[in-house]
């Protein structure tokens, strides 16, 4: 199988797509990614080419069969790490997020057991206690935005439960430093300095400055954990114990990307779930009554992930030709399986724009179209954690509070790097739920 990292050769045709300049397409996609994808599919069918400033042509594969084959393809022939690094230069080639082939398998293998469903299930009590401590400090009777609150919660969960940071001062400092880092404008920068894009160097400079204290705190924790020598099952413990031994710099490099990738999408998913339940009080009531582990809760969570997936797409850069249902895409092509389009496939999800959790009662026409966590060898490693956070945190929120959306119109997704965030960050008004009831354990 020929392997090449080069772009498609000049003259090799790509599928048709919008003819507007790349800068115009980039702006339109950032403002309304779902609308841009739906318009392109309506005009050009399930296979079309978009052009993004600083990235170039990207072929969108919205046919379910072809998209599933792309996600499940040989990782050497369809490289996710290379595609991510092209979009996100901060994605280190040494991390499980930005690596490919053997390096990806090694990086993922080092931390996989920390995300094992059995281990995550044991964290349920800690998840609920952290959620309760955060919800207790939310404003009552005055508006606030839900997304920043959920970011702080997921950062706290990751630092304390997934990394296992026991030093209270260091844990608090790391959560605060991660919060500042993830609030960097454009983070991860859409216009990095190695591309001649306005504002790229400035945005990246802010990102690098806020990155330093996070890296320093992680390095301190790695050193402390190595000095302790006590085995454990947290991500840090597994990295410290890995063979061959990682240098401190290598461990921090991997941790930085894993921290961002394992926190940002779950916090967005939590905010979207609050937004959906605040606009559908009857569904919120069903969520509360169902209790942890009930199929009703699973269905509500899955329908939210279908209609409002945090991830924009599964990205792959081809190193060998790929047959997209009769259309051969050449090696070097940047491709994406756009998750919002897969989740709006009319055959798989009739009346796709309706928020209807009952569709997940086990009778999906094509369950393979539901891909909120991607697929294949690059399926999101943090899926068990994200689902546990949605069950535990949202259970606490709606057992304790009545939540009302401030705006009459639903939030729309906007692009932020490779994720889709609510454009107003979910402004809500909360009041006490009477009588309040504790969230039972799983």
Go through each PLM region and give its residues.
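Conserved cytochrome P450 K-helix E-x-x-R motif and the immediately C-terminal K′/meander segment
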Residues: 25-45, 292-327, 346
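Cytochrome P450 catalytic core segment centered on helix I
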Residues: 3, 14, 177-245
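Cytochrome P450 heme-binding "Cys pocket" and the immediately downstream C-terminal segment
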Residues: 383-419
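Central I-helix of cytochrome P450 enzymes
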Residues: 154, 158, 211-219, 238-291, ...
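N-terminal membrane-proximal hinge/A-helix region immediately C-terminal to the signal-anchor transmembrane segment
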Residues: 1-92, 97, 106, 133, ...
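Conserved cytochrome P450 K-helix/beta-meander segment immediately N-terminal to the heme-binding cysteine loop
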Residues: 337-363
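Cytochrome P450
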Residues: 3-13, 36, 51-59, 80-83, 92-112, 118-129, 138-160, 169-176, ...
